[in-house]
Amino acid sequence: MLPSLQSLTKKVLAGQCLPEDQHYLLKCYDLWWNNAPITFDHNLRLIKSAGLQEGLDLNMALVKAVKENNYSLIKLFTEWGANINYGLISVNTEHTWDLCRELGAKKTLNEGDILQIFIDLKFHKTSSNIILCHEVFSDNLLLKKVNNLKMRIEIFWELREIIEKTDLLNNEFSLNTLLLKYWYAIAVRYNLKEAIQYFYQKYTHLNTWRLTCALCFNNVFDLHEAYEKDKICMDLEEMMRIACIKDHSLSTIYYCYMLGANINQAMLTSIQYYNIENIFFCMDLGADAFEEGMALVGQEGYEPIRNILSLKIYSPATTPLPKSTDPEIIDHELKNYFSKNMMVFLTYDLR
């Protein structure tokens, strides 16, 4: 729809960085949401207000306004360029549905529309967005229009490491449960602290899932928060196994090692999952399970790892890492870490 002169004026005003003593102007123009002024980043198409410091994409802001039956903001965001069809995903009253139709929305969303809206809305990895996605899509009857397999493929792709190598997420779960675990996992993967706390407080039965995601996605900060502060427990060797699922998971491997997990077992798990950087890191920490590793790679397809393990050139790193489970220290030490034994292998291979 074509924006009115008034909505264009509001758009310009919302793009200004007004001092606090001029916020009354924004309130006069209905640029007010959750008892705070609305600002609009024109380039990023982000709406910001109280509780939305990270901002919401314009389409997601419309979804939230529709969910809250905020008619003035529904009209405003639509005039600013939001896709009114997105509002149908969260409409919950007949009056709001009628308003969306007046503003140009389709009579109904088809499967392709719903799936595309789901893909678009989950794109922005912020706490505000992930929490709202959870609230909007949880028990949403419109999802019944979407082929169940298509939805599951969208969820499984981003969580494929956990799905392939643990039994904590599978096709036996309902779509609603899968979505809940998906949003929680995304919050942990991207260290969205506000969203993590939201899910932790609301879904205590998923504490093990939180710990699993922190281990698998190498989030040593939330791992420490969950294990040390929130006292979420798991068998130490199982923690190390999960940490070795993905390659480049040095921080969570080291954290588990500092807790006392077996570094030789970590090396063998990394071999099993074909995670070469993890293997060299375990060697740096003193792992020497070469014979067991060679037995493990006896099967076809492990030739590069067999070549690595066959050489008698490795030894523990001479400069030890700090003996600490402080996530800040671990992250600082390992952010730009390059394995001493990997360097030995690479230079040996070049001779």
From Swiss-Prot:
Taxonomy, superkingdom: Viruses
InterPro entries: ASFV_MGF360
ANK repeat copies, ranges: 57-89
Sorted UniProt keywords: ANK repeat
Short name of any one Pfam family annotated for the protein: ASFV_360
Protein's GO biological process: taxis
Function: Plays a role in virus cell tropism, and may be required for efficient virus replication in macrophages.
Family: Belongs to the asfivirus MGF 360 family.
Protein's UniProt name: Protein MGF 360-12L
UniProt source species: African swine fever virus (isolate Pig/Kenya/KEN-50/1950) (ASFV)
